[in-house]
C-alpha cells in the first residue's frame, strides 16, 4: 500500500511463487530456468496486471522499491510484473524505471457494444467462424446436449474444478485447481461469479467459471471433455453460451483470456499483447 500524507494512493497485490514460470513463458526470454523463487504482481492466472490507482511516477517508483525490498527479504531471485498490457501506462512507467518489457502472450477481448443477442454476434463474424458456431449448436442439440448458466455457488464446483484441472493438466498446469481452494474461492465470490455448464445427457462435457465486473464479463477458467458423440466440439458450444450470457447481462466487453489464438481470432476476438517486466534481485 502506497500512502501520501496518510492517504492511500496506490496498492499492489503480489505473490511469492516457488517456480516462478509455471506456464513456461519466461524461460528463453529471461536468463532463468523457471524453477527460481519469484515475487510477481498478482498471480499468473490474472491476465490484467496493473497498479490500481496509479497516479504518477512517484507512486510507481515507491511500489517498485517496496517490491524489490520485499523480494530481497523473502529470498526471491526475481521480482516484477507479468501480464502487463502492451501500450499501458504501467508498461511505460516500468520501462522508464529500467525494467525490460518482453512479450510473453496475447490476451483476447470482444467488443459487445451494439450486440443484442448471440445471433447478432454470429452474424457479425466472418463466414468461417459463423458457420462453425452455428453448426456446433445444431449438431449438439441433435445429440442431446444442453447448456445452462447459473450462479457459481449453486453449481457443483468440485465437478467443474475437476474438469478444469483435467484440461489444464494437458498443458502441465493441472495444479492450478486444488479442489478445496478452488471451490472455496469461487463460492466466496457470490454474485461476481457464474457457472456455464454444457452436458450431454447427465455428463459434464464443458464448463466455465466466469467473473463479472462493472463493464466486463471474464471467461476466467474452463474445462472441456472432447469424448462426445454427435460430430460436434464442446469448446465452441461453451464459448457461444458464455458470450450469450455476457450479451444478455449487457456487458460492454467479453474478456476471452489468453492463448488459443487460432480459435479466438477466427471467432471475432481481438488480441492485446501482454509483456513481462522483471529484474533480478
Model feature map: region roles:
Residues 1-34, 78-231:
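A conserved beta-strand-loop-helix scaffold within acyl/acetyltransferase catalytic domains
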Residues 188-189, 267-275:
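Short alpha-helix boundary/capping motifs
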Residues 19-102, 214-271:
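Acyl-donor binding region in acyl/amide transferases
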Residues 171-175, 193, 251-256, 272-276:
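Acidic/polar loop patches that form or flank catalytic/metal-binding clefts of enzymes
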Residues 102-110, 271-281:
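Conserved catalytic-core motifs of GNAT/GCN5-like acyltransferases
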Amino acid at each position: 500500500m502506497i500512502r501520501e500524507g496518510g492517504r492511500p494512493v496506490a496498492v499492489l497485490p503480489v505473490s511469492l511463487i516457488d517456480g516462478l514460470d509455471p506456464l513456461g513463458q519466461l524461460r528463453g526470454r529471461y536468463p532463468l530456468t523457471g524453477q527460481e523463487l519469484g515475487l510477481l504482481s498478482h498471480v499468473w492466472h490474472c491476465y490484467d496486471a496493473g497498479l490500481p490507482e496509479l497516479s504518477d511516477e512517484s507512486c510507481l517508483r515507491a511500489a517498485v522499491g517496496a517490491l524489490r525490498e520485499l523480494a530481497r527479504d523473502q529470498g526471491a531471485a526475481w521480482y516484477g510484473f507479468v501480464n502487463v498490457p502492451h501500450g499501458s501506462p504501467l508498461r511505460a512507467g516500468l520501462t522508464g524505471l529500467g525494467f525490460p518489457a518482453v512479450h510473453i502472450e496475447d490476451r483476447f477481448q470482444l467488443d459487445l457494444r451494439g450486440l443484442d443477442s448471440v445471433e447478432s454476434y454470429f452474424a457479425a463474424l466472418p463466414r468461417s467462424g459463423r458457420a462453425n458456431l452455428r453448426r456446433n449448436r445444431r449438431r449438439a442439440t441433435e445429440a442431446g446436449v444442453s447448456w445452462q448458466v447459473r450462479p457459481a455457488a449453486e453449481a457443483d464446483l468440485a465437478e467443474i474444478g475437476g474438469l478444469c484441472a483435467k484440461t489444464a493438466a494437458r498443458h502441465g498446469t493441472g495444479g492450478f485447481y486444488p479442489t478445496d481452494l478452488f471451490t472455496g474461492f469461487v463460492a466466496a465470490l457470490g454474485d461476481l461469479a457464474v457457472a456455464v455448464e454444457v452436458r450431454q445427457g447427465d455428463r459434464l462435457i464443458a464448463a466455465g467459471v466466469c467473473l463479472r465486473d462493472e463493464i466486463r464479463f471474464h471467461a476466467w477458467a474452463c474445462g472441456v471433455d472432447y469424448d462426445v458423440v454427435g460430430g460436434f466440439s464442446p469448446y465452441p458450444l461453451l464459448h457461444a453460451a458464455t458470450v450469450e450470457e455476457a450479451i444478455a447481462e449487457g456487458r460492454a466487453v467479453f474478456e476471452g483470456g489468453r492463448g488459443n489464438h487460432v480459435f479466438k481470432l477466427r471467432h471475432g476476438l481481438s488480441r492485446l499483447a501482454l509483456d513481462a517486466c522483471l529484474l533480478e534481485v
